[in-house]
Swiss-Prot record:
Name of protein: UDP-glucuronosyltransferase 1A6
Species assigned in the record: Oryctolagus cuniculus (Rabbit)
Residues carrying covalently attached carbohydrate according to the record: 294
Domain of life assignment: Eukaryota
CDD domains attached to this UniProt entry: GT1_Gtf-like (cd03784)
Transmembrane segments annotated in the record for this chain: 489-505
Main location: other
Length: 531
């Protein structure tokens, strides 16, 4: 009865929430997306806004990966100086290089160079957009009410300044954790692990030392990645621009966070948490996949996907993986577009695409092998499926650490693991009941919320359009770094203390000299007369 009452209360809250913001329709929204998996969550929000009657324009490079047509929005296409073949080559190179061996010292440099293969292409997209006169003329005449963008690449941030539009940012996290610096959130290194460290929020002293040093590198890394965008901003705006200040122009941050998964940390009032927004209620399986699931018998299935960026795995590693999958009794559905491993077992089926969320929501799914991208991690949490994680790049190592810390999965190094390592990890998360219990607890906590993340995101985009911004802006943005840390106050008080101490010392020294120095001189003079 209590459960039914609780469910009814949540439903009532959701209905009331929707009713309160369901009357304002018909605003114009400009969307500057980032291609690839970043677009998937943004697309859900954009289509929900389009379904509510808003006029939405999405800026799309003529060569793209996932930015397809939709009845819910209009695409404005701008030219880019490369073709589909070059784009495919860049993405393929990006995926393949994550399987090359690297030393501990060369790892960060290799990771940086590999990421730049794709990041340079995104920069070319931005450069082409900001230099395309027809598109800029169209945007100036568009009379948009707000701009919605993914600030991982700051093209939309620059356009918002150029057009004078309030902004909404949909974001997972900069490679340098600077969303909190830009947003004004306290970000202490003592318990908030920095990106790429693979630390938890319970750090040892040596880990805190490393965390502190990594924190010092974040600003240089930001300028290393984004200095070219600052040059673009100067070119477009015809004035000197400090790129970080553009991120601080009163945006609403829609952060794909949920503290069920993330480590707890302070956030600002203009930061809205919508983690798990990509988790939809599972649809009905197609006949093809239903047949796979039904044929699995009592052992069930394992879902395996390394994301859209990995199209092929080196033959030796693919054969090791295939050998491992053949050692478990479950049926394995492996999303893989590369060459078929010669030793592929009878229990393993290769598919070019799979309905990941629907399969994870099936009661016969026993485990999820994932590269630990945030979309896959949240789908695993939503559906309560324990995970074997093979992180490859970016924030995936940190995501895997979070799940492992909560006892809901096992992490393997994809370059170093053996066939037995993978097989044993699968058997562990499937047969050890604690992994299922822990992920089910995370799932229960994650889904127990008064408002769905998609509804919350739509509300805040409409809020910005209605009020032309109005996000709470912390005064921290107006302070210098030494004011923010109260170093001027500390220096002033320290100066007072030192001055008082100095004056006190001088007074004491003077008094000592007057009281005892004179007696000493008199005694010395008396002795000299006697002699």
């Amino acid at each position: 009865m209590a459960c039914l009452l609780s469910a009814a209360q949540r439903a009532s809250a959701g209905v009331l929430f929707v009713a309160l913001w369901g009357t304002v329709l018909g605003d114009r929204l400009l969307v500057v997306p980032q291609d690839g998996s970043h677009w998937l969550s943004m697309q859900d929000i954009v289509e929900a806004l389009g379904a509510r009657g808003h006029e939405i324009v999405v800026l799309v490079p003529e060569v793209n990966l996932l930015l397809r047509e939709s009845r819910f929005y209009t695409r404005r296409i701008y030219p880019v100086p490369f073709d589909q073949e070059e784009q495919s080559y860049r993405y393929r190179t990006f995926g393949e290089k994550h399987f090359t061996d690297r030393s501990w010292l060369s790892g960060p440099q290799t990771e940086y160079r590999n990421n730049m293969v794709v990041i340079d292409m995104y920069f070319i997209n931005c450069q082409s957009l900001l230099r395309h006169g027809d598109t800029l003329d169209f945007l100036r005449a568009g009379k948009f009410d707000a701009l919605f963008t993914d600030p991982a690449l700051p093209c939309g941030v620059i356009l918002a300044e150029y057009l004078g539009l309030p902004s909404v940012y949909l974001f997972r996290g900069f490679p340098c954790s600077l969303e909190h610096g830009f947003g004004g959130s306290p970000n202490p290194v003592s318990y908030i692990p920095r990106c790429y460290t693979k630390f938890s929020d319970q750090m040892s002293f040596p880990q805190r030392v490393v965390n502190f040093l990594v924190n010092l590198l974040e600003v240089p890394l930001f300028y290393c990645l984004y200095s070219k965008y600052e040059d673009l901003a100067v070119e477009l705006l015809k004035r000197e621009v400090d790129l970080p200040t553009l991120f601080q122009k009163d945006p609403v941050w829609l952060l794909r966070y949920d503290f069920v998964f993330e480590y707890p940390r302070p956030v600002m009032p203009n930061m809205v948490l919508i983690g798990g927004i990509n988790c939809k209620k599972p649809d009905v399986l197609s006949q093809e996949f239903e047949a796979y699931v039904n044929a699995s018998g009592e052992h069930g299935i394992v879902v395996f996907s390394l994301g859209s960026m990995v199209s092929e795995i080196p033959e030796k590693k693919a054969m090791e993986i295939a050998d491992a999958l053949g050692k478990i009794p479950q049926t394995v559905l492996w999303r893989y577009t590369g060459s078929r491993p010669s030793n592929l077992a009878k229990n393993t089926y290769l598919v070019k695409w799979l309905p990941q969320n629907v399969l994870l929501g099936h009661p016969k799914t026993r485990a999820f092998i994932t590269h630990s991208g945030s979309h896959g991690i949240y789908e695993g949490i939503c559906n309560g499926v324990p995970m074997v994680m093979l992180p490859l790049f970016g924030d995936q190592m940190d995501n895997a650490k979070r799940i492992e810390t909560r006892g809901a999965g096992v992490t393997l190094n994809v370059l170093e693991m053996t066939s037995d390592d993978l097989a044993n990890a699968l058997k562990t998360v499937i047969n050890d009941k604690s992994y299922k219990e822990n992920i089910m607890r995370l799932s229960s906590l994650h889904k127990d919320r008064p408002v769905e993340p998609l509804d919350l995101a739509v509300f805040w985009v409409e809020f910005v359009m209605r009020h032309k911004g109005a996000a709470p802006r912390p005064a921290a943005h107006d302070l210098t770094w030494y004011q923010y840390h109260s170093l001027d106050v500390i220096g002033f008080l320290l100066a007072i203390v030192l001055t008082v101490a100095f004056v006190t010392f001088k007074c004491c020294a003077f008094a000592w000299g007057k009281c005892f120095g004179k007696k000493g001189r008199v005694k010395k003079a008396h002795k000299s007369k006697v002699h």
